[in-house]
């Protein structure tokens, strides 16, 4: 529990089972928000429905939008945008704090010359969201450049997906380029 998170948001029952089993080792964890599968676990007082929380947030914002506006006003370029954990290949995994300024600098320095600001990139996304390359090169890039993201979660499906998607941006780690090369040479 390196993050000491108070809330965990999980997408499905499989991941929920893992997080719920680890809850004892996470003393600061107060709530688990389930995107899918809430009905099966609503008897647990620390489990909440993502969809119900979104609706409650909308209602609260209608009642008093100044709270949200005030919270937004506190965000600065140095504010935390996200935490990304390293893989731990050179030791214990570490949580890396990424600021909004870090995100913008990365997008501009890596892609500023390749993708003009007025272009709307079509981006293939296949890396896990926990991977910094996926966050910066796919998701943040698409948000910043008003682009489109096309997820291809199974790498083996890439060959069939590329002609359909016709990406204008394709970010790849060396292992992926090696697999492409091997496929072309076969």
List each language-model region with its residue ranges:
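Conserved S/T- and glycine-rich ATP-binding loop of Class I adenylate-forming
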Residues: 8, 80, 86-89, 123, ...
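Conserved AMP-binding/adenylation subdomain of ANL enzymes
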Residues: 104-122, 129-186
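Conserved acidic residues
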Residues: 6, 30, 78, 121, ...
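Structural core segment of the AMP-binding/adenylate-forming
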Residues: 1-55
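Conserved pre-ATP/AMP-binding loop-to-beta segment of ANL
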Residues: 48, 55-85, 92, 116-122
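Short hydrophobic/charged patches on amphipathic alpha-helices used for structural packing
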Residues: 1, 69-72, 159
